[in-house]
Amino acid sequence: MNEQQLESIKRKNEWLHDLVEVEFPTKESLEGREIYNRMLEQKTYEVSSNTLLLDNESNLSVEDIFLVDFHRLTVMFSILQAQRWADKHEQEMIVEFLTQIILTPEFELYVGFKEGEPVGAAIVSQYEGNTLISDLVVSQNLDKRQFVCDLGKKLNHDQKLSETIVIEN
């Protein structure tokens, strides 16, 4: 990975870290941040071109994937994200941490739906010609790689997909 790609990952992680850097953070949100940061140590990343994402068949249409732009979707995003942890207490702390997210154009949250049920979520950010797709989570009804491709098509449709994609595994 090049410097810009590494920086895009660092920026996203710093943004999430700073969510609870407030005057009176809850102990639950601080614990959730610690749990989240431990998970980050296990993450790997791959670099791909946008054509590899766009050439696959779609499972979800661009109309099935929504940019999170209000609190209820933020809560759905957080609940989906919490499924990445097996422990119930850790799930609760992750929800507490992630529901602190303040929506910003630099770091966009997406939630995918199938038959009215939330089935996938991710964070997307852009930095110097790179699109970072991170914090991927899918329900048992959807393949993670498929969701990345479907999200890529949504981003391309909205003219938000760079040539180079960094995908968090």
What are these regions (language model features)?
Residues 1-62, 165-169:
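Acyl-donor-binding surface of acyltransferase catalytic domains
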Residues 2-8, 81-99, 104, 129-169:
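Acyl-donor binding region in acyl/amide transferases
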Residues 4-5, 13, 74, 99-101, ...:
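Generic structural signal for short, flexible, solvent-exposed coil/loop and linker residues
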Residues 42, 50-97:
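Short amphipathic alpha-helix that is part of the acyltransferase structural core
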Residues 45, 88-91, 111-114:
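A short linear-motif detector with a strong N-terminal bias
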Residues 51-60, 111-114, 129, 133:
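Short N-terminal helix-initiation segments at or just after the protein's N-terminus
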Residues 106-120:
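Conserved beta-hairpin
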Residues 124-128:
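A short acidic/small-residue loop/turn micro-motif
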